[in-house]
Amino acid sequence: MLHALQWRKYMAEENNNEELRHLVRIMNTDLKGAKPVEYALTGLPGIGRRTAILIAKGAGVDPTATLGYLPDEEVAKLDAAIGKFEEIVPSWMLNRQKDLTTGQDKHLLGTDILLTFREDINNLKKVRAYRGLRHERGLKVRGQRTKSTGRRGSTVGVSRKK
């Protein structure tokens, strides 16, 4: 069993004695350099493991390689592959299909995904849709039971007879 120091030396020897970069900046986000590429890319909102593997393969980078040891050229390739992800994969794999305003299939990343999600909920509230009303009232939206679960606030005890 290798200790942490021995492991670091082994990894440095394997990667031509390059120093590990602990933070790698991709798409204006700091990603952990100690993780493999397929796990590190999941730090970006809108990218899961499956999409991370496809992005790495599309960029010609080994998904199991440690992100911090990759040279700058390969990190730039990853950044470019993330930008053209919509062209690489079929439309059913994108996270925003048939957008309400444009009707296009898109893959949202970063803060765009959060802003669009919030905008959709506000739109549902504005048109007074059932889902919008449930969101407004802070209740369950997808048809779950609410008789006994999903309660908030402090519990009210039952008073006993003397």
From Swiss-Prot:
PROSITE patterns: RIBOSOMAL_S13_1, RIBOSOMAL_S13_2. InterPro entries: Rbsml_uS13_C (IPR027437), Ribosomal_uS13 (IPR001892), Ribosomal_uS13-like_H2TH (IPR010979), Ribosomal_uS13_archaeal (IPR019977), Ribosomal_uS13_CS (IPR018269). It comes from the Archaea. One of its GO terms (molecular function) is structural constituent of ribosome. GO terms for cellular component: cytosol; small ribosomal subunit. Keywords: Ribonucleoprotein, Ribosomal protein, RNA-binding, rRNA-binding. One of its GO terms (biological process) is translation. Pfam families: Ribosomal_S13. Residues 142-162 are annotated as: Disordered. Belongs to the universal ribosomal protein uS13 family. Part of the 30S ribosomal subunit. Forms a loose heterodimer with protein S19. Forms two bridges to the 50S subunit in the 70S ribosome. Located at the top of the head of the 30S subunit, it contacts several helices of the 16S rRNA. In the 70S ribosome it contacts the 23S rRNA (bridge B1a) and protein L5 of the 50S subunit (bridge B1b), connecting the 2 subunits; these bridges are implicated in subunit movement. HAMAP family: Ribosomal_uS13. This is Small ribosomal subunit protein uS13. It comes from Methanosarcina mazei (strain ATCC BAA-159 / DSM 3647 / Goe1 / Go1 / JCM 11833 / OCM 88).
